[in-house]
């Protein structure tokens, strides 16, 4: 793929308050948390596996406004679900949440599957990816929500 990122549709996220990060790589997860620190009003929750995120939503009965989801989630357990499998289950347990695939994968088939499964955007990690993520959050961030 020639592009660094592919954006699907980015509807306005009403009252963006809570972002969940599903990323198995601790360094990548911490980079996202640091990046999102630019928005101190947001509540950030992190998960190293998709199953942990799914369980948290089911048990707490609280759905995030936005989930940032990696594709490869198997660095700690090779049997872990991949990001597309997690996206499918998250859409079931949290249908009002929005989902962004934020990953190092740059594969057109996976991009298309993510779109079909309901991801609002597919962003390839890197400087341009963080710029796009910042733009999406900034353009959809409603300070009146607080």
Where are these regions (language model features)?
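Alpha4 helix (beta4-alpha4-beta5 surface) of REC/receiver domains from two-component response regulators
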Residues: 85, 105-123, 131
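Non-catalytic signal-transmission and effector/linker regions of two-component phosphorelay proteins
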Residues: 1-20, 25-31, 130-146
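Two-component/phosphorelay signaling modules centered on CheY-like receiver
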Residues: 26-51
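Two-component signal transduction core modules
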Residues: 67, 99, 122-123
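Short amphipathic alpha-helix used as the core "switch/output" element in two-component signaling
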Residues: 78-96
